[in-house]
Amino acid sequence: SQGRGGRRIEEGFSMVAEPSMGFAVGDWDFYKVVAIPIDKGQSSSQSVGIEEIWGEGPVGPLYMSVGRHPNVWGPSLKNGSLFSGQARGLDQITVGSDGTFRLPWILEKIGPTRLSVSLSRLEKDRNIPNSYLVGYRLNAKPWRSLEVGLLALVHSGGEGSPSASVWSRVLDHLIVVEPLTRLGTPERQRLAISNRFAGLDFRWRLPWETAPQIYGSLVFDDLGKPDQLDRVFGQDASYIVGMFVPHILGNDSQYMRFEYRETGIRFYAH
């Protein structure tokens, strides 16, 4: 896990052991982390539980990951706008390309590409119990020192959510930019069935050995109308810019990370 992995800070002294175990079966790897409370704090309600349990490996031309583990998107491992190592592990299924491929036609110019799709179900103690997250991510490497990513995330379903037809659900995932969803829907009913995010990120490695990496990301929460750009890039957006400096004092295990983040007041709140 990266960061706290969603672990709560308890009042008073507490101690938890987290033994982990990993093994391989053929081309598949499996991993498990169990939390065992030894000394509980004054506010603790923690009991023995599974923090992470998952397996991953190739399935034909695809690569699959199944189980509970932290989902990290983008170059900021601990502070991503949508997924990060600070959050509790999600029960999920992720399917992606096993290795890189080239897109056809002029899109070949964006270089080696990876595509992944993930489906997660949130727990019953969330704001919208038992809802679903479906994420789409495309990574490309147009130059040797530059990596870019495009992403979309759809949060829908769960207790209390509005009902919708199968076609509306499918179209809701195919079109993630809000203004376009009005095509063919005069009453804009589909806008009420989910919350959608779209964004991009990059990582630029300076062209020498053990050089710093400069990175950033921009994510929007439900894009608005063209005449609302001040709201789109202000209240509805989340920005991250940072620099990662590896090999401090020649030690591979020491590094520094400088990061700035700003999130609009409507982000996560739609």
Write out the residue ranges for each language-model feature.
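N-terminal periplasmic/intermembrane-space "pro-region" immediately following the signal or transit peptide
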Residues: 1-9
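Surface-exposed coil loops of outer-membrane beta-barrel proteins
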Residues: 2-3, 45-46, 69-140, 149, ...
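Residues that define the transmembrane beta-barrel architecture of outer-membrane proteins
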Residues: 11-17, 40, 46-51, 58, ...
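Residues on the lipid-exposed face of transmembrane beta-strands in outer-membrane beta-barrel proteins
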Residues: 19-23, 53-57, 66, 93-99, ...
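Short loop/turn motifs that connect adjacent beta-strands in outer-membrane beta-barrel proteins
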Residues: 23-31, 58-61, 99-114, 145, ...
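Transmembrane beta-strands of outer-membrane beta-barrel pores
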Residues: 25-29, 36-40, 59-61, 68-72, ...
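Membrane-embedded beta-strand positions of outer-membrane beta-barrel proteins
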Residues: 32-33, 66, 95, 115-117, ...
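Extracellular/periplasmic loop regions
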Residues: 158-188, 199, 205, 211-213, ...
